[in-house]
Amino acid sequence: MNRYILFFIFLTGSVGGITAQQAKIDSSYANWYYQQRMAYFEKLPTIQRAVIFLGNSITERAEWQELLADYRYPVLNRGIGGDNSFGILARIDDVVRNKPRAVFLMDGINDQFRKLPHEVSIQNYRRIVRKIKMKSPRTKIYIQSALPINEMITTEDYTRGRNELVPELNKKLSQLAKEEDVVFIDLCPLFQDDEGRLSKEYTVDGVHLIPTAYIKWVKLLKDKKYL
């Protein structure tokens, strides 16, 4: 009997160990590029009441200042290629230190690439939103949807099976926005095809947008009176 008990303990302990390994969360973010961008931001002039676009490479690649050259408030790009919700959370105090007029937040796809559970991403988003509210109460907060990808174009293994997770993440982001009383902006209809993939019309690599796609993005923000 004791042998069976010991075997059961060994078996359940092993299964528990496997589960714990599978549930391990990758919260890293401060790679060399992240650190370089942060060092660059620290050296820029202080600008009060700006509109800030905050996110990963999809945000960073846009020429927001030129796209909004006629806008009545300063516009700042605070995108960092490869960033994720942990990285944005870590730098949000710096982002809102100068009391921005508005923050347009987009993240999510890099969380999916590293297979973070949606619950972890949403928790980070919630903490980001609440920090903005606490540090800069007058700042308007806009949560923008994660964009789909096109796995028929992408060549990286880490993108496989990720696109099917985007709709559920966006559903949770929309719910979060309601709970936190901030605005959710669904960008997916602008850029996805009939199959829910990032349209070939707007991407070359299956993940990032071509430059002209940002013109359409800004037009939506203006049409909706967010800008």
Question: What residue spans do the PLM features occupy?
Answer:
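Bacterial Sec-dependent N-terminal signal peptides
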Residues: 1-23
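Catalytic His-Asp segment of secreted/periplasmic serine-dependent ester chemistry enzymes
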Residues: 22, 148-227
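Serine-esterase "nucleophile elbow" of acetyl-processing enzymes
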Residues: 20-102
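Solvent-exposed loop/turn segments at secondary-structure junctions
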Residues: 57-61, 81-85, 109-114, 147-151, ...
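Proline-aspartate-enriched helix->loop->beta-strand connector
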Residues: 99-108, 137
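Surface-exposed cleft-lining segments at the edges of enzyme active sites
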Residues: 77-80, 109-121, 156-162
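Charged helix-capping and loop-helix junction motifs
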Residues: 118-128, 166-169
